[in-house]
């Protein structure tokens, strides 16, 4: 076996998994309309998004610990097989409770990113790990761009079609893993430890670190604000602009591409010229302005130029992450990244519930209030930024 084949297989697994997730994004509200009253679609959509994120948050450390104990391959294969069956069940869900159970199972089986990351760490040397983790992120990003486009095209025929396609992709993933994916964890198997199963344990180390805690609060708020389009883009596009599933899929892909390009090509030059602190502030201003403009947009075409502004707002998060990384020693970088990942998962739980509730409460008067609320949340960053940026982080951030 060629030494790079396991890497290619695991990266393909990550990409196909992301495509499967993205496939159902444009059509989930349409599927809900077949099961609940139209006035209840927004509330159930938000709960389903939050439920999926909650299961990922709770189960990611569990799957990671199980892979340490029993190996990466069996955990991945069981998850992929479960996902294939789950998507097939959701495609034919006759009742709402079946769809809820399906999203719970999808969240559990979808929490395999930690296992895939551990697999890559097993098969690569230290000097190559950063590059290969970059490949992993790129493959996931590709899947999340391609998935909504394909899902939107399929959704034009039936809201059930993308679910069947996602089931088929996970089935293909499972078969590929069975025949081509060897076990990577061949060292000593670690016993299960209770603390390894606790997703909240990653926050304890930061207690008493004033600057880090302040900047992590900013990180949480920014990630929470980022949940506005994640929770509302599909429903808002349908209600305000009367988009169909195909248009929604294209818009999601366009947004993903623009956001990725902005982070890859703009963040570095802007941070180098203005400093990380100003890049962070510029990103928040661009994002908040985009939200306000989108709230008042009256035609579907207006959303596409506004996307450029929203994508430019994406430069703020990498700048903040760089500032945070400067505040901790090398031996704590892993803990920092784990804490940031946990915070991201928490916002994926809270955000959909919060913003779909605001949207549902205001839809009969004006459905732009949720975007205004998201922009207003950036104001909560100001006290934490004042404490974090001007008490030591600011001097480092502009170096």
Curated annotation (Swiss-Prot):
Please give the biological process terms from Gene Ontology that the record holds.
proton transmembrane transport; response to antibiotic
Coiled coil in keyword set: no
Q: Which GO terms describe its cellular component?
A: plasma membrane
Q: Give yes or no: UniProt keyword Transmembrane helix.
A: yes
**One MF annotation (Gene Ontology) recorded for this entry:** antiporter activity
**Compartment(s) of residence:** Cell inner membrane
Q: Could you list the residue ranges that cross the membrane?
A: 7-29, 44-66, 73-95, 99-121, 133-155, 160-182, 203-225, 245-267, 279-298, 302-324, 336-358, 368-390
Family annotation (Pfam families): MFS_1 (PF07690)
In terms of PANTHER family, this protein maps to: FI18259P1-RELATED, ZGC:174356
Purpose of the protein: Resistance to tetracycline by an active tetracycline efflux. This is an energy-dependent process that decreases the accumulation of the antibiotic in whole cells. This protein functions as a metal-tetracycline/H(+) antiporter.
**What does the sequence similarity comment in the record state about its family?**
Belongs to the major facilitator superfamily. TCR/Tet family.
* Protein name in UniProt: Tetracycline resistance protein, class A
**Whose protein is this, by species?**
Escherichia coli
